[in-house]
Amino acid sequence: MEHIAADLLLKGLAPEGFADGQPIGLVTTDSREVCPGCIFVAFPGERFDGHDFAAKALEEGAAYVVLNHPVEGVPAEKAVISPDSYHAMMVMGANYRSQFHPKVVGVTGSVGKTTTKQMTYAAIAGFGDTIKTEGNQNNELGLPRTLFRIGKETEYAVVEMGMSHAGEIERLARCARPDVGIITCIGVSHIGNLGSQENICKAKLEICAGLAEGSPLVLNGDDPFLRKAALPGHVRPVWFSLGDESADVCALNVRQEGDGMAFTLCDRAAGRYEVTIPAMGRHNVANALAAYAAATRLGLAPEGVIAGLADFEQTGMRQKVVHAGGMDVIEDCYNANPDSMKAALAMFREYPCKRCFALLGDMLELGEMSASAHEELGRQAAGAGLTALVTYGPEAARTAEAAKAAGLADVVHAGDYQQAADALLARMKAGDALLVKASRGMALEKALALFYPVCGK
């Protein structure tokens, strides 16, 4: 974080004249990070309440503290009162971002946000100093933290925007003010909160609130909800598609090559290019098209963008291929929903191996559609060419039963991680491949931690 005058950073939070021009070099929510000249933002929590550390933060040199309410021992002239700590972070993030002028790409969508963010970063990073959202910092706390990493030398920023409820993307977009927006697709994540995919589409389109007149909005032309959506008149839609040559950017001759994909990219504004990406599945080709469209609509050269995509690196447990004991394990257990499960199984069906196995766990936050979604997953698994399916989790029990009913002979529902690992170890051998996928809360990496030592990783 570059130093910024306190009165500029706190504009809209503190009364006019409250803060002086003292330079602030850090905004933190962690009392252990407090240093002279910082602002400490107190968050109430289940285990710790940041308000309990406010007075100590001032003793250690904090210039100001942001509180939900007055705290004994904290002078009024040092306390910025904001009933909502998240709102305070967003205001300061927006104020800080307004002092710098990098080109910003905002990424949202039901599926593929993080991969598309990573691909966009890879596409852009070779053109200048670039920052991106790290980890899952895609909410009203994480986005300001990302913006605070912008510096004087930063030329580009790629920020991910997540949501659980309507209105959240709008607040994030107004804070980040992206130059280009991306909506990857409209799925069913958080449908329990929003009620329908139409409402999810409206929520994702809130990214337009942060886009200026004429700004490009990169959209999935293969998504029926986006295709029929009423787009705001101030944005310029840029459509991408797998196969539709009428789209602004499309992919033809899509094929798997080793652990990645190859395709012909057709850009109506720039011509045709042969592209390879180190990520499997047609869905990742779509993510690459979105990244390419965003980067080139910033004015970056297609050849450099394509070279960057070839160096893309997947993060965390997102379709990471691990070679263990002569077997390939595709770790894709960072998150899951019906759309990403379907895409993963489609990718896995084409995977070059002797036999294919899958360990699938619960998809969380599906509300009333959870039962039907897990049953449909079982039917999809039965049609995916698997040798055997192992499931874990209470909802995944429905997946196991549906897979059996659909004709998959070898199905095991594991009661714990050890049972899951044992079921796989008893069946798999060198030359086989395993797909591991579930929502983050299922922690399927714990089953892999029991699987790997035995199979020889």
Model-derived features: positions:
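ATP-dependent carboxylate/acyl-activation modules
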Residues: 107, 316-318, 441-449
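Short acidic-hydrophobic, aromatic-tinged amphipathic segments that line or gate anion-handling sites
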Residues: 79-84, 411-420
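Phosphate-binding loop of NTP-binding sites
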Residues: 11, 88-221, 225-233, 426, ...
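Residue-level signal for inorganic ion chemistry
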Residues: 38, 57, 92, 107, ...
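Active-site beta-alpha connecting loops in nucleotide-dependent enzymes
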Residues: 45-48, 315, 333-407, 455-457
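N-terminal leader/targeting and accessory segments in enzymes
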Residues: 1-91, 351-353, 379-380, 384-394
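A short acidic, helix-capping loop that chelates divalent metal ions and anchors anionic groups
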Residues: 188-194, 330, 363-367, 436
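Acidic, Mg2+-coordinating active-site environments of NTP-dependent enzymes
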Residues: 67, 71-76, 182-328, 353-354, ...
